[in-house]
Amino acid sequence: MYIGIDCGTQGTKAIVLDSVQKKVIGVGYAKHELITQSNGRREQQPNWWIEALQQALQIALKQAKNSPHFSPNLVKGIGISGQQHGLVMLDKNDRPLYKAKLWCDTETATENDILIEKLGGQTAVFEKLGIICQTGYTASKLSWFRQNYPDKFANIRKIMLPHDYLNYWLTGKFCTEFGDASGSGYFDVVKREWKREVFKYLAPELNMDEVLPKLLSAEQKIGVIKPEIATLFGFNENVIVSTGGGDNMMGAIGTGNIREGIATMSLGTSGTLYAYTQKPLLNLPPMIANFCSSNNGWLPLVCVMNITSSNKQLMNLLNIDIEELNQLAQQAPIGANGITILPFFNGERVPPLPNTKASILGLDSSNFTRENLCRAMMESATFTLRYGLDLFRQAGLKTSQIRLIGGGAKSSFWRQMIADVMNSEVVCLQEEEAAALGGAIQAMWANGEGELEFLCETFIHLDENSKAYPNLSQVKNYQNAYERYLTHLSQLY
């Protein structure tokens, strides 16, 4: 038995994977609150994640007990997936010094611009790190905290990412792995080491060797759970914890995206598109994040900020649910009778427009209908990901199949839209919780249950009924709408 945990923005999910029956036998979920302000602030209390982990895991364990083969004492390992980039800072007593600023926080855009300038510009940053620092990365959050809370900053004793914090709670071990570390903005993704020069600029008062976690490779286990954790859940004290990783890295493992030629597209609050490579790509467009993977390779990735979150904006406005959104959108033609939406309700990362606002364009008295607005909103979210796929194609990253995860992937209408807009085959997985599944599989790998390729082939299964193929006539119509979207976008970037 293995446990997978996914600590996301909206909540924490837990699964129990039966490695003998080769299926998930328990699932649990607990919601997170989110602190927001109009200036781009997006924060959470780190202890909320611990509370949610406990709640979600207890639900999953209770469900798993319906299986005649299950006992908590049979659990062998745990793997943690966590939202990337969040800044967790602990004092000498291991208490958080401040709320965790999240990946979607754009309050630190100015600090990020200053950081890039001080380091010599984007080209110089890329030469130092193998990646361009974006506003959502951890580095600018650290700079912001130093400027706004200098007294508290001096008391920092540990700096962590969200999944590191949960690993620390489970094991007491202060460490991280290359995948999540590569989204910090002070990590060299090519050499796979902390970048002393960059960290010294961000935190000259702090000793990098003391406050940053030890780096481990992905197949290592970081240790076993603490005795009190074993008691809390009824586990034995030999349960191992794998290195875990960022949610995108764990999503890659959980979708079998561990070899070249496959792309994973996540349709969640934000949207991500990523593909595995065996070597770091040094000729990528700056908007592609050249992350490390959590299986000791690399994971070029594009992140856009407004996917299901933009749909929810319209759903709240029209007082409709997701089924009604889909139904209304299907009643409008491709292109929404000329309406284009730039859905940047939370700013945007790709292209880098952290302070921009959303726009609805092309309205007139004849096309201003609920149906057209619903269609335009879903199309616009899809177009933001198509923009990312175009960057992949320009960089020579070839994919034969896109594997969809996230809540948006449940819509057959949206899946077909994505297939048409991307002009690519798309498919979902039988197990919906890909990041949590990736965590459980990584824990099996770390515990010597087999090579990762074998484990992915054994435990990951495509949902053949979900496959969608591009409809050539619709591909052309969507291309026309996408080109109109690009024309409007060019006024901003």
Curated annotation (Swiss-Prot):
EC number(s) per entry: 2.7.1.17
GO terms for MF: ATP binding; D-xylulokinase activity
A single BP term in Gene Ontology: D-xylose metabolic process
One Pfam match: FGGY_N
Tagged with keyword Kinase: yes
Catalytic activity field: D-xylulose + ATP = D-xylulose 5-phosphate + ADP + H(+)
PROSITE patterns referenced in this protein's UniProt entry, alphabetically: FGGY_KINASES_1, FGGY_KINASES_2
Active site residues of this protein: 247
Marked site positions, Important for activity: 6
Domain of life: Bacteria
InterPro entries, sorted: ATPase_NBD, Carb_kinase_FGGY, Carb_kinase_FGGY_CS, FGGY_C, FGGY_Carb_Kinase, FGGY_N, Xylulokinase
Sequence positions that bind substrate: 84-85
Role, per record: Catalyzes the phosphorylation of D-xylulose to D-xylulose 5-phosphate.
Family, per entry: Belongs to the FGGY kinase family.
NCBIfam families: XylB
Official protein name in the record: Xylulose kinase
Native source organism of the sequence: Haemophilus influenzae (strain ATCC 51907 / DSM 11121 / KW20 / Rd)
Gene giving rise to this polypeptide: xylB
